[in-house]
Curated annotation (Swiss-Prot):
InterPro entries: NADH_UbQ_OxRdtase-like_20kDa, NADH_UQ_OxRdtase_20Kd_su. This is NADH-quinone oxidoreductase subunit B. It catalyses: a quinone + NADH + 5 H(+)(in) = a quinol + NAD(+) + 4 H(+)(out). It holds the Pfam family Oxidored_q6. Belongs to the complex I 20 kDa subunit family. GO terms for molecular function: 4 iron, 4 sulfur cluster binding; iron ion binding; NADH dehydrogenase (ubiquinone) activity; NADH:ubiquinone reductase (non-electrogenic) activity; quinone binding. Keywords: 4Fe-4S, Cell inner membrane, Cell membrane, Iron, Iron-sulfur, Membrane, Metal-binding, NAD, Quinone, Translocase, Transport, Ubiquinone. GO terms for biological process: aerobic respiration; electron transport coupled proton transport. It is a peripheral membrane protein.
């Protein structure tokens, strides 16, 4: 096994055997003789043997549709930069949508006030299950610079459940992309059927 070298110093990878489970890195059904035989027979014919949970989770992480709930400067500075051609969030399978009824992820960016909190909850309730929330910037995370103001909600997690917090004032585009990748990792880890 391993990498072999020929006389011309060309590295040749060994022929893959079976289908690898992305969660464990081991061949699917390697502890079961039945699945081992099926994988051996079908691997070279282009067939995939997997579970329904793994298939749904794979589809979920590769096609997240996000909408922004932009309240202040983070929505303009961070989201526009991350969506631009330099960082291009769509290469990770994350595409923007305008309607909450078509969205899986809501990115809350900016200072949430008491008057805007019911609107945030209403938009969140319109999203289909499973739904995820990314809190972007220190104002959305905990009130930020306006934390002690009478009209500011001290974090959007007091209104909607938040899955990923992206810190910064404003957060960089790299930080937002890292938050999206962490959300995809969380979806792979927890799955969608349990949620």
């Amino acid at each position: 096994m391993g990498v072999s070298q020929s006389d011309h110093q060309t590295l040749v990878a060994p022929q893959p055997k079976g289908i690898l489970d992305p969660a464990t890195g081991k061949p699917v059904g390697n502890d079961s003789t039945f699945f081992g035989e099926i994988n051996d027979e079908l691997a070279d014919k282009g067939f995939l043997v997997t579970s329904t949970q793994a298939l749904i989770t794979w589809a979920r992480t590769g096609s997240l549709m996000w909408m922004q709930f932009g309240l202040a400067c983070c929505a303009v500075e961070g989201l526009m930069q991350a969506s631009g051609p330099r960082y291009d969030m769509e290469r990770f399978g994350v595409a923007p949508r305008a309607s909450p009824r078509q969205s899986d992820v809501m990115i809350v960016a900016g200072t949430l006030t008491n008057k805007m909190a019911p609107a945030l909850r209403k938009v969140y309730d319109q999203m289909p299950e499973p739904r995820y929330v990314i809190s972007m910037g220190s104002c959305a995370n905990g009130g930020g610079y306006y934390h002690y103001s009478y009209s500011v909600v001290r974090g959007c997690d007091r209104v909607v459940p938040v899955d990923i917090y992206v810190p910064g004032c404003p957060p960089t585009a790299e930080a937002l992309l890292y938050g999206v990748l962490l959300l995809q990792k969380k979806i792979r880890r927890t799955g969608t059927i349990e949620r």
